[in-house]
Amino acid sequence: SEKNIHVIETKTIPQGITALTMFNFEGSLEDNIKAMEKGIKEVKTGSVTYAVRDTEVDGKTIKSGDIIGLKEGNIEEVGNDILEVCRKLIQDMVDEDSELITLFYGEDCDKDKVEEFIDEIEEIYSDLDVQCFEGKQPLYYFIVSVE
């Protein structure tokens, strides 16, 4: 069968997920492309992982094993507590236009601690929708999406 297809370029997992959620089975190819590309532009991506070596970046001294929070690939937060780094990263990402915070927690996270953390985030950002999913991703404690 002949089908019209178009590849939507994304660079992060949250961008890909946002593009998928914008897809309308009833819509035309052109309308879907526009909606997906618009959604991708509106999503901010963050991640929480650990440093694999000592370094200094943008005036931040980082030691191997430190917890780092990245926003759009740039190191924004450095600390030794996963949840505190994630909390600060979310604060860096949320602005007056934000409506939704989505977190995907990794295989090395404690589910009970994550649930408590999500309760705290929901309280802090009570005017936003907050979602959390078990991503089971290696290396990254959290992947964060703010739309």
Summary of predicted features, one role per range:
Residues 1-147:
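N-terminal loops that bind phosphate or other acidic moieties
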